[in-house]
Amino acid sequence: MRTLWIMAVLLVGVEGSLLEFGRMIKEETGKNPLFSYISYGCYCGWGGQGQPKDATDRCCFVHDCCYGKLWSCSPKTDIYFYYRKNGAIVCARGTWCEKQICECDKAAAICFRENLGTYKDEYQSYGKSRCTEKSLKC
């Protein structure tokens, strides 16, 4: 019950591209992004350290690196627009930053879909304190 309350509180503060990213994840994987990816492994969710636990966690590591290259943008709050054409995500309209944030999110959502077969429930709600190996560099 406490976990649900914490997630509800987090949702209240979520805006901008995080909502769009969540929708992309749901569309690509069929999974609820809050329950499946928000604290998966060592890199999914806020922050990241250590070694990615599996291919899904590596998607999050690469996503973090992608956001890191956008130092002049606000990836978690800038709102972007996307649509689907023949099933594919198309990042559309907006500023350079908005389009780049969308491309980062698109790549991660596709990566999650491509690695659904390696997704492990044991890495859901994985404590970052358990990620003690030397961190990777982007």
From Swiss-Prot:
Disulfide bonds: 42-131, 44-60, 59-111, 65-138, 66-104, 73-97, 91-102
Reaction catalysed by this enzyme: a 1,2-diacyl-sn-glycero-3-phosphocholine + H2O = a 1-acyl-sn-glycero-3-phosphocholine + a fatty acid + H(+)
Keyword annotations from UniProtKB, A to Z: Blood coagulation cascade inhibiting toxin, Calcium, Disulfide bond, Hemostasis impairing toxin, Hydrolase, Lipid degradation, Lipid metabolism, Metal-binding, Platelet aggregation inhibiting toxin, Secreted, Signal, Toxin
Cellular component, GO annotation: extracellular region
Signal sequence region: 1-16
Essential cofactor(s): Ca(2+)
Active-site residues, Swiss-Prot/TrEMBL: 63, 105
EC numbers for this chain: 3.1.1.4
Family label: Belongs to the phospholipase A2 family. Group II subfamily. D49 sub-subfamily.
PANTHER family according to UniProt: PHOSPHOLIPASE A2 FAMILY MEMBER (PTHR11716), PHOSPHOLIPASE A2, MEMBRANE ASSOCIATED (PTHR11716:SF9)
Function: Snake venom phospholipase A2 (PLA2) that impairs hemostasis. It weakly inhibits ADP-induced platelet aggregation when tested on platelet rich plasma from human and rabbit blood (15-25% of inhibition at 5-10 ug of enzyme), and dose-dependently inhibits blood coagulation, possibly by inhibiting thrombin activation. Exhibits strong hydrolytic activities toward L-dipalmitoyl phosphatidylcholine. PLA2 catalyzes the calcium-dependent hydrolysis of the 2-acyl groups in 3-sn-phosphoglycerides.
Protein name (record): Basic phospholipase A2 Tbo-G6D49
